[in-house]
Amino acid sequence: MAKFVIAGKANCPYYAKAELLADYLQKNLPDFRIFKITQHPDKWEDWVEDVCERNMWDHRTSPIIWRELLDRGGRGLLLGGYNEFLEHAQLYYGVTSNMTTELMMVIAKENMQTHTEQQLDKETMKDLISPLQVWIASAGTYVCCHLIPLLLSGEVFGMHTEISLTLFDQEQREDCLRSIVMETQDLASPVLRTVSFCTTVKEAFLQAQVIIILDDSTEEEVYSLESCLRSRVPLCRLYGYLIEKNAHKSVKVIVGGKNFVNLKTTLLMQYAPNIASNIIAVALGVEGQAKAVLARKMKTTSANIKDVIIWGNITGNNYVDLRKAKVYNYESAVKGPPGHYHSVLSLIFDREWITKEFVQTLKILSSTGKQFGGILAAHSIATTLKYWYHGSPPGEIVSLGVMSEGQFDIPEGIVFSMPVKFENGTWVVLTDLEDISLSEKTLSRLTGDLIQEKLVACGDLLTFQPIEEDPKDNEPSNTGMNEEKEQPGSDDSDEKNEDQ
């Protein structure tokens, strides 16, 4: 059987003439088969050079015709161009072509139009079936190992969304990345299309639609505070440049971890201004810690506690606000209907525990990073992404680090954790909540550290000076007690029913 491949520029008249002759031979000869390849004129030279280099041929003009010896795509024997094919047809089959130049030009024009339409159709189909491009930066950290199964569970992006996962880290972490890739493949997740790793900086975040920034895997703990702050700038500058250059224009960037999360988010926004509105910082980890401490005190589960608000620096000086906090399914003498809840502050009668032990426990957890391990960090990131794509539970308050635009009298230009809700693929700051205004002292304390972090990191301030707290003024404010218009133990806040 004679198997020929005819390739040429889509607008080449000689390709059109060779194609028509080959069609005639295939129609009339039982053992004559052809395969056609058209290339856009702009891509022809690179394509034919690659084919000739691969097969050790010497041919540059259009068309190029070769005979395949065995199977389609297998080893081939170069025949030549149009003239060689015409001579071959005359000698072997006694057939020639009498196509006029005018007809050749008409068919070449039609071929070009058809090629263009087919390419557009291919691009459209590719967009319909292309997987979601997810990148994880600093993927050599242990958090990544806990995060990957959550991303591939189908709960974050949906069971019908396929994922192409790329792990990015420094070159010295290549062995670790290779191991994680193999383990990820072993999961055999139905939503995983491909998984790979990248250690080449210039290729980072290529066509990324979701980027997860974790703590740097090579961070040192021997720096001074000022050195730590300044060391974040080069990496964030690099990431910002790469995201702007390589990522999809609607990329979603989520920053998680336990070290300077607000600062890193601020710097990324500064160095990637075109996608700044799509960069957020994860605060659900701190929120989860606060809920767990409350749950242990109230002898319930942390999942029953809702609407704890985290203000300020997610991984530093923050304010845990319980004024809107609720507990559902609480074991008490009176049981309400589904959706019934109690105010958390109305059920904790030990005010000294709230103002001292609770505050101190959270402060220790925040300052040391203890108990903020891989499981909690991964779950917080995955849950925030799920809310971003599918919306947060109706009526529920979520804490999120976003760029301040002056809401709640917070200075502009800093990333600040505040109450939000997710809906329709974005988030909305809940500025319409009642009785959650912050006192001037509390606001000054929370914003002061964030502003100093940014100034020190950018070299505008040499020394970081933590703002000293006044225990009498600020201990109660950590739970929001001194911010309420009504005392938490009042009858009005004891029991409520939430609209379903």
Curated annotation (Swiss-Prot):
One of its GO terms (biological process) is malate metabolic process. Keywords: NAD, Oxidoreductase, Tricarboxylic acid cycle. One of its GO terms (molecular function) is oxidoreductase activity, acting on the CH-OH group of donors, NAD or NADP as acceptor. It comes from the Eukaryota. Residues 489-500 have a biased composition (Acidic residues). InterPro entries: Lactate_DH/Glyco_Ohase_4_C, Malate_DH_type2, NAD(P)-bd_dom_sf. Gene3D superfamilies: Lactate dehydrogenase/glycoside hydrolase, family 4, C-terminal (3.90.110.10), NAD(P)-binding Rossmann-like Domain (3.40.50.720). Residues 465-500 are annotated as: Disordered. It is an enzyme of class 1 (oxidoreductase). Its EC number is 1.1.1.-. Coiled coil: none annotated. Belongs to the LDH/MDH superfamily. MDH type 2 family. This is Putative malate dehydrogenase 1B. It comes from Mus musculus (Mouse).
